[in-house]
């Protein structure tokens, strides 16, 4: 009986150790996933910021282009009056 109890205890101990090892591995995996998530979040924020900057630059260039077109039209209008 004592021998059987010892064997059961050893099996239980092995199962507990396996569970502890599995939990440790899962915790490490969670940490890696958290780091990956933080990295991807930072990258997404940077891309969002870059997109906003590009949109602002695009708006400015379009406004500059319209202003130049207006100046050219004005100059052409003045030239028409001179002729």
UniProtKB/Swiss-Prot annotation:
Homodimer. The ends of the coiled-coil dimer bind to each other, forming polymers. Interacts with FtsZ. Belongs to the ZapB family. It is found in: Cytoplasm. This is Cell division protein ZapB. GO terms for cellular component: cytoplasm. Keywords: Cell cycle, Cell division, Coiled coil, Cytoplasm, Septation. It holds the Pfam family ZapB. Non-essential, abundant cell division factor that is required for proper Z-ring formation. It is recruited early to the divisome by direct interaction with FtsZ, stimulating Z-ring assembly and thereby promoting cell division earlier in the cell cycle. Its recruitment to the Z-ring requires functional FtsA or ZipA. The keyword Cell division applies. It comes from the Bacteria. GO terms for biological process: division septum assembly; FtsZ-dependent cytokinesis. Residues 7-80 form a coiled coil.
């Amino acid at each position: 009986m004592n021998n059987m109890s010892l064997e059961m205890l050893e099996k239980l101990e092995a199962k507990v150790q396996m569970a502890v090892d599995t939990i440790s591995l899962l915790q490490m995996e969670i940490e890696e996933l958290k780091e990956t998530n933080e990295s991807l979040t930072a990258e997404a924020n940077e891309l969002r910021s870059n997109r906003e900057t590009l949109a602002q630059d695009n708006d400015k260039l379009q406004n500059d282009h319209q202003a130049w077109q207006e100046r050219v039209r004005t100059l052409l209008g003045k030239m028409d009056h001179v002729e």
